[in-house]
UniProtKB/Swiss-Prot annotation:
Family of this protein: Belongs to the protease inhibitor I48 family.
Organism phylogeny: Eukaryota, Fungi, Dikarya, Basidiomycota, Agaricomycotina
Disulphides: none
Name of the featured protein: Clitocypin
Recorded superkingdom: Eukaryota
Any Pfam family the entry gives: Inhibitor_I48
Keyword Transmembrane recorded: no
Task performed by this protein: Binds and inhibits cysteine proteinases. Inhibits most strongly papain and cathepsin L, more weakly bromelain and cathepsin B while it is completely ineffective against cathepsin H.
Application notes: Promising candidate for a biopesticide. Slows growth and reduces survival of Colorado potato beetle (Leptinotarsa decemlineata) larvae in a concentration dependent manner. Younger larvae are more susceptible to the action of clitocypin. Expressed at low levels by transgenic potato reduced larval weight gain and delayed development. The inhibition of digestive cysteine proteases, intestains, by clitocypin was shown to be the underlying mode of action.
């Protein structure tokens, strides 16, 4: 994935292109959970993210909206099942391209847990960390369509 400004739409690995509409990663403020909201006012300006590849091949996802007093992005206080993704000090993530797509990625925390991958998904309009077997089983997984802003 190229560095740039993106909107991140919630999709799944089994349905990476669900059509019109959908929900997008939305910031509501520093140290608050990142939400999944429609790409409409009043949320539109809260859905702009700077995605940057770091030297180690991992990525940071930082809020790039208007009137940002300080830098924050995808982060966490704890990596437990269903813990929220928060808008905090940007952490690094692994972006794994979903096969047969050009712009859909699984966002994985680079945390070593025996036998599981820690991935970002959604639960009741809040982005949360989900745990899946590392062997690829476990069915449909949360994924994100990265739509570049010009």
């Amino acid at each position: 994935l190229e560095d740039g400004i993106y909107r991140l739409r919630a999709v799944t690995t089994h349905n990476p292109d669900p059509g019109v509409g959908g929900e997008y990663a939305t910031v509501e403020g520093a140290r608050r959970p990142v939400k999944a909201e429609p790409n409409t006012p009043p949320f539109f300006e809260q859905q702009i993210w700077q995605v940057t590849r770091n030297a180690d091949g991992q990525y940071t996802i930082k809020y790039q909206g208007l009137n940002t007093p300080f830098e924050y992005g995808f982060s966490y206080d704890e990596l437990e099942p269903n813990a929220p993704v928060i808008a905090g000090d940007p952490k690094e993530y692994i972006l794994q391209l979903v096969p047969s797509t050009a712009d859909v990625y699984i966002i994985r925390a680079p945390i070593q847990r025996i036998g599981v991958d820690v991935e970002e998904g959604g639960q009741q309009n809040t982005l949360t960390y989900k745990f899946f077997p590392v062997d690829g089983s476990g069915g449909d997984r949360p994924a994100w369509r990265f739509t570049r802003e010009e």
